């Protein structure tokens, strides 16, 4: 089984401002969508922070995976966030210190993500997600694409 998590925000800048963020989740088993979840809400945050909030909320909905056979695919248009997702295990092993010896920024949020996704095989993909943002903003997502 695979869970796809699409992370979106309407904040296109690195500046903190009033914005909205959200996620779409879909559970897929053997090519069939078997469940969906979504959320869209406001905050005051920069782009990265808004997307990280979406990731924290979405990953918090995941059930524990003790078998280690399920995959989670995080889809975002933010390369730094995708890199963070792929660095989770290393950061945790290194005491939440990045490769150049600096502490991981927003460590508490990343710890929550790591705890929620423990046991899953994690992948990240950088691609446009505007389609999902539009659906969330309009409240039209019903699990169909």
Predicted regions and their residues:
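RNase H-like nuclease fold core
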Residues: 1-49, 60-61
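Loop-to-helix element that buttresses phosphate recognition and phosphoryl-transfer chemistry
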Residues: 50, 54
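RNase H catalytic domain
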Residues: 59-138
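Accessory terminal regions of nucleic-acid processing enzymes
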Residues: 142-145
